[in-house]
Amino acid sequence: MPKYHLKAPYSPKGDQPTAIARLVEGVNQGQRYQTLLGATGTGKTFTIANLIAQTGRPALVLAHNKTLAAQLCNEFREFFPDNSVEYFISYYDYYQPEAYVPVSDTYIAKTASINEEIDMLRHSATRSLFERNDVIVVASISCIYGLGIPSEYLKAAVKFKVGETLNLRSSLRELVDNQYSRNDFDITRGRFRVRGDVLEIGPAYEDRLVRIELFGDEVEAIRYLDPTTGEILQSLEAINIYPAKHFVTPKERLNVAVQAIRDELRERLQVLNEQGKLLEAQRLEQRTAYDLEMLREVGYCNGVENYARHLAGRSAGTPPECLIDYFPDDWLLVVDESHVTCSQLKAMYNGDQARKKVLIEHGFRLPSAADNRPLKSEEFWRKARQTVFVSATPGDWELTQSDGQLAEQVIRPTGVLDPLVEVRPTQGQVDDLLAEIRIRAKKQERVLITTLTKRMAEDLTDYLAENDVRVRYLHSEIHSIERIEIIQDLRLGEYDVLVGVNLLREGLDLPEVSLVVILDADKEGFLRAERSLIQTIGRAARHVDGMALLYADNLTDSMARAISETERRREIQKAYNELNGIVPRPAGKRASNSILSFLELSRRLQTDGKDADLVQITGRAVDALDSDQDSGLALDALPELIDQLETKMKEAAKNLNFEEAASLRDRIKKFRQKLIRNT
């Protein structure tokens, strides 16, 4: 059993010990499905961390978006600093899939921008699954897409061991076959160079270099190096260098795949010609012939993923292998915010197939392109082993699958009760709301307001701003990482009120919010259903004086059930506090998200400084750094500033400007020390 070392400054409290014990017992007894029904702020992540530590299973934690996945990954890394906690999301900064619009005869080619840092994290996850058993992978729903063939990926790894004889030419050929490229001047991820008896490799899964030192034909030493300074970081006895891409196709299989593609093309052309679709047949023949030529010559072509079924040797209709297939047999699945995530799993396949069907019908792709797809919902659950659903409002499907295997977690370790819920009439609601906002603002507390329409949210935001309220408006067009920045500004007190159409956002931690306002609460629909109301009310559940105001003229069934459930939990919490002499206290979580800061910084640096907001922020910071007047810099800004200075330092070193690089190094050291002292 792998040894997880759970480190936390506190122990399980309230009903956490009972929930942990029940879940651990269920896993050990082989229960297929269980549900953790945990109210907002009760420490569900800590409970799951204890479950993983006590069962010792490799775990996949599935979240419904990359924002929540990053938040969970940060928390698990704090709980398990000595274990492998990995982050696996889609590596596209921008993605426009291939499509065809028959009405306007418009073909849209695939365009994408890959984030190299996310790609590195994805490779790090699969490498850890091959080499360790104490692995927790926090992933978004993108993990159900094809990810090569695990057995081929493992078999293709180039192995080096101290003392063994090495055929350097053969090893270099293997690296090239594994999508590494030779560059003797600028070595980064996915590249290698040879200097005399020294081979240096930039592995796809980390930012350190690997140096293989030879004495004749014998491997004399294997070392990890700092890519900028060349400093030796660690010596190794052996190492596996995994492919630079997850899709690895041996030459013999490639030849078989090319023949299979040619056979399918011949059959498809016959069908199209019989249907009188001569234009489509000509288009398909030209495109596929070009792709086949590229595959034969260089082993790659644009849109190669559309031939994934042939390259993997799969039969028609069979599911692709994905991240799940890299896990060992005894892995554990945790589905966070399962009432949303499980629904996403069902929707992914249908959306993908609708687009592919049009491309196939009009001669842009072979029918086998439809098998380059995400898993169907039923395929995913067949692959899944033991599963724990986690939600404050689990869906009916999860509860049915769990069949009574339910662990409820209602009591917060902080002693904070569920919010008071009050229903008020809509007449005069805006003036009443304005008065409530002013009360909270004086106490430096925050307010969330959720409306039914975008227009209503815009009008309300304008009205509040005209009345000297510090307010921001959150809408669907805002980039997910910019959204995090807006929420962090709310937490840091840059403004007092956040208005939006859908602010329930499962898993969002906002301890500063003391008031949640739901306008038009009696308008039945998705945004005012029982689960949505409970989730929205829960945004104030981390504040000692949390309150939810529902403006409505009628009491709907959804409202009644949501209010009843909130009151039930509140009574349980109050009774527990009185019995144990607990006084509610604030949660006090820091407003930070290191993974998102890291990824966003990378994305913006790749725009070559075109992002005005970044220039404005970093300009002030660099001025402060240059003048050594750093006392006014916020702690939350330091990780981003350090990352920027490291980039500048590496560029200076690359340009042989060593004095500037040394100066930047000293500043980085100073800011790291400040960060350590204050965290």
Curated annotation (Swiss-Prot):
HAMAP family xrefs: UvrB (MF_00204)
Pfam families found in the cross-reference section: Helicase_C, ResIII, UVR, UvrB, UvrB_inter
Family according to the record: Belongs to the UvrB family.
GO biological process, one term: nucleotide-excision repair
Domain Helicase C-terminal intervals: 429-591
Species name: Prochlorococcus marinus (strain MIT 9303)
Main location: cytoplasm
Domains: entry comment: The beta-hairpin motif is involved in DNA binding.
Residues holding ATP: G38, A39, T40, G41, T42, G43, K44, T45
Gene3D superfamilies recorded: P-loop containing nucleotide triphosphate hydrolases, UVR domain
A cellular component term, taken from the record's GO annotations: cytoplasm
Top-rank lineage group of the source organism: Bacteria
SUPFAM superfamilies noted in UniProt: C-terminal UvrC-binding domain of UvrB (SSF46600), P-loop containing nucleoside triphosphate hydrolases (SSF52540)
Motif Beta-hairpin, chain ranges: 91-114
Database matches in NCBIfam families: PRK05298.1, uvrb
Complex formation: Forms a heterotetramer with UvrA during the search for lesions. Interacts with UvrC in an incision complex.
Ranges for domain UVR: 639-674
Location of the Helicase ATP-binding domain: 25-190
Name of the protein in question: UvrABC system protein B
Keywords attached to this entry: ATP-binding, Cytoplasm, DNA damage, DNA excision, DNA repair, Excision nuclease, Helicase, Hydrolase, Nucleotide-binding, SOS response
Molecular function terms from GO: ATP binding; ATP hydrolysis activity; DNA binding; excinuclease ABC activity; helicase activity
Role description: The UvrABC repair system catalyzes the recognition and processing of DNA lesions. A damage recognition complex composed of 2 UvrA and 2 UvrB subunits scans DNA for abnormalities. Upon binding of the UvrA(2)B(2) complex to a putative damaged site, the DNA wraps around one UvrB monomer. DNA wrap is dependent on ATP binding by UvrB and probably causes local melting of the DNA helix, facilitating insertion of UvrB beta-hairpin between the DNA strands. Then UvrB probes one DNA strand for the presence of a lesion.
UniProt xrefs under PROSITE patterns: HELICASE_ATP_BIND_1 (PS51192), HELICASE_CTER (PS51194), UVR (PS50151)
Coiled coil spans: none
